[in-house]
Design a protein with these regions (language model features):
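Short SAM/SAH-binding signature in class I
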Residues: 71-79
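Conserved SAM-binding loop of SAM-dependent methyltransferases across substrates and taxa
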Residues: 14-26
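S-adenosyl-L-methionine
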Residues: 35-69
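Conserved Rossmann-like nucleotide-cofactor binding loop
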Residues: 13, 38, 108
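Conserved SAM-binding motif I beta-strand of class I
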Residues: 29-34
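Single conserved hydrophobic/aromatic residue that forms the stacking wall/gate
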Residues: 1-5, 9
Length: 157
């Protein structure tokens, strides 16, 4: 997600992406929505550690809060509580020009995001990233792969 000073963000998670976006967008606002009270607390802690006064943290379900938030320019979805397609539809309903980025660690979430973008007429770009660690096994160094993460970007042209 590239950012500009006027961009508005909506985010679900534990704070790392919210903080990064807040630092990038300068005078823009970041709205961090999470239904997990522990994640809300961690996001608030990181907001203060990194001096990000432009983050507004909202506890609760994304679907219950999207309508109340300003029209977003960029949206990051790191978890959806099973409502991924509905969230995608709702964001594009508010702003057809929004850029939505979803992270997925399962094929089912990848599929649901692609289907949600397809239903809305959005173009998609997918990047898959994975981490590989090494482990010493005798005189050999073995590569041990971690779970891959899919990053799906949806835009309506």
């Amino acid at each position: 997600l590239s950012s500009a000073a006027s961009d508005v963000y909506k985010r679900q998670g534990t704070g790392s992406v919210s903080v990064e976006m807040a630092l990038q967008c300068g005078s823009g606002r970041v709205y961090a929505v999470d239904r997990n009270p522990e994640a809300v607390s961690l996001t608030d802690k990181n907001k203060h550690i990194f001096k990000c006064d432009n983050i507004e943290i909202i506890g609760g379900n994304a679907m219950d809060n999207i309508e109340k938030l300003p029209v977003p320019d960029r949206v990051f979805i790191g978890g959806s509580g099973g409502e991924l397609q509905q969230i995608i539809k709702m964001v594009f309903k508010k702003n057809r020009k929004a850029v939505i980025v979803v992270t997925a660690v399962s094929l089912e979430t990848l599929n649901k995001s692609l289907e949600g973008f397809r239903i809305c007429g959005a173009e998609t770009e997918i990047v898959q990233v994975s981490i590989t660690r090494t482990k010493s096994v005798g005189e050999y160094t073995m590569l041990c792969g971690e779970n891959p993460v899919f990053i799906i970007k949806g835009t309506i042209l």
